[in-house]
Amino acid sequence: MNKLKILLHVILFTILTVSVVFAAENGFKAKLTGNDEVPSVKTKAKGEIKFKLSNDGKELSFKLHVKNIKNATAAHIHSGAYGKSGPPLANLFTGPKKEGKFSGDLAEGTITAKDLSGDLMGKTLDDLVQFIKSGETYVNVHTDANPNGEIRGQLK
């Protein structure tokens, strides 16, 4: 009976470990703040974005949640290491502009290969995923007051 209990614990531990590893490999996120913008921006706004890759690797779903953002105009995934700016690779939010102060889900959707732009135009979604895993991508939210970006976070 004790051997069976131990075996069940080992199996359960293995399943949980594999599930956590699988989730980490198929999910990406970032915390967005003004301090991470280049140059940094003094703002009370902040945000969080979460991505999940489909099992077949053809869709990357996302949800972008923000707090205290004012007059948000756009949000993108950009290429660029921490502290460096780069061009957009995919649109996350393109309007209509959120007038006034806003807290809530700014954007939610799915990215596929046809949504890629800039250096990744015509490439596969796996190319974007590899770029994210390399640490060379960030998300930022643009506003009227800060058209180059008010809050930013490096994807991990």
Label every PLM stretch briefly.
Residues 19-75, 79-156:
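Metal-centered catalytic cores of metalloenzymes
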